[in-house]
Regions:
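Acidic (Asp/Glu)-rich catalytic clusters
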Residues: 67-78, 112-115, 144, 166-169
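Beta/alpha (TIM)-barrel catalytic core signal, keyed to glycine-rich beta->alpha loops juxtaposed to Asp/Glu
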Residues: 127-307, 311-312, 322-329
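Conserved beta-strand positions
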Residues: 18-20, 53, 121-124, 154, ...
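Alpha-helix N-cap and loop-to-helix initiation/capping positions
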Residues: 30-35, 61, 65, 94-102, ...
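N-terminal binding-site loop/beta-alpha segment at the start of enzyme catalytic domains
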Residues: 1-78
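Short, acidic/polar
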Residues: 30-43, 98-114, 158-163
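Active-site groove signature of glycoside hydrolases
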Residues: 111-129
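A short acidic, helix-capping loop that chelates divalent metal ions and anchors anionic groups
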Residues: 22-27, 86-93, 285-288
Length: 329
């Protein structure tokens, strides 16, 4: 597996990471713990060194699974996790909380669940409008000085927030959704990250499964699958967006690869400091995704794909109104 540096931070990771959320959270019932551990370890064996989790996934369960899976390989991998919420009595209600004392409490819990003495990359999961970002960055700066955290990251933050945070504690990586069907980061965020030397970690690089071609207008999602609340996964939106799936299929056929592989290869070709983190619960999909790192798209290929994407209008918001209000702050 090829390696990449996240911006100018010196943090080196595999060109593709593994987003672990879906093993425990968000896409239906949690995967059997033993199977989840085996999948994560299979990723390590195939050269993946970058693993993404968060306390909110489960909540807590995903960190426990990741910690158990990676314990034998701790010195070979980079573990990223996130803070930023407190939870209601039922552990379902998520309340934004990035107060300094809560960040410290969250870090202690994450260290325990991840079975480690240091968090390689700690993200603020969502910007908390009630806590100045300078206070957040300052707290993480202190945690880095104390040896409990190595690198600071932000997730779904807006440009001004990134600048303000970076002025207090250098930001190693921004994690936000970026893919062929969510290209807004190209407008303002990518130029800013390049200017500041910050790496970019796209989550949902396969459009939460849509770009693989597996989701059709008749596809239904259970109540425990958060796509059931997302406007972009309503039947009418899926039907309208099938033009993108058709285009991907055509491009993939021309290269003799899969739609998922083209989608990932296109992302990797955008910038050398971009590290997508596709998730999966299946070994064959893991291997398919990782093979995308070996696909070389020429500048001409990338330009032609991008020009084709410009002709397609994506229908539907990517979040419910409640969750949409929490991004880009």
């Amino acid at each position: 597996m090829q390696k990449r540096y996240l911006g100018k931070s010196g943090l080196e990771v595999s060109a593709l990471g593994l987003g672990c959320m879906g093993l425990s959270h968000g896409y239906g019932p949690a995967t059997d713990t033993r199977q989840a551990i085996e999948l994560i370890r299979a990723a390590v064996e195939r050269g993946v060194t970058f693993f993404d989790t968060a306390e909110v996934y489960g909540p807590y369960l995903n960190e426990e699974v990741v910690g158990e899976a990676l314990k034998p390989f701790r010195d070979r991998v980079v573990i990223a996790t996130k803070f930023g919420f407190t939870f209601g009595d039922d552990n379902k209600q998520q309340i934004l909380n990035s107060r300094p004392e809560h960040i410290r409490e969250a870090v202690e819990g994450s260290l325990r669940r991840l079975k480690t003495d240091v968090i390689d990359l700690l993200y603020q999961h969502r910007v908390d409008p009630d806590v100045p970002i300078e206070d957040v960055a300052g707290t993480v700066k202190d945690l880095i000085a104390e040896g409990k955290v190595k690198h600071f990251g932000l997730s779904e933050a807006g440009a001004q927030t990134i600048r303000r945070a970076h002025a207090v504690q250098p930001v190693t990586a921004l994690q936000s959704e970026y893919s062929m069907w969510r290209r807004e980061p190209e407008q303002e965020i990518l130029p800013l990250l390049e200017e500041l030397g910050i790496g970019f970690v796209p989550f949902s690089p396969l459009g939460k499964g849509f770009l693989t071609g597996a989701i059709k207008p008749g596809t239904t999602f259970g109540k425990d699958d958060y796509r059931s609340t997302v406007p972009r996964f309503a039947a009418q939106a899926i039907e309208a967006n099938e033009k993108l799936v058709t285009l991907l299929g055509k491009l993939a056929a021309e290269k003799g690869v899969t739609s998922a592989q083209i989608a990932l290869a296109w992302l990797l070709a955008q910038k050398p400091w971009i590290v997508p983190i596709p998730g999966t619960t299946k070994l064959n999909r893991l291997e398919e995704n990782l093979a995308a790192a070996d696909i070389v798209l020429s500048q001409k290929d990338t330009q032609q794909i991008t020009e084709a994407l410009e002709t397609i209008k994506i229908v539907g918001e990517r979040y419910s109104p409640e969750h949409q209000a929490r991004v880009g702050r």
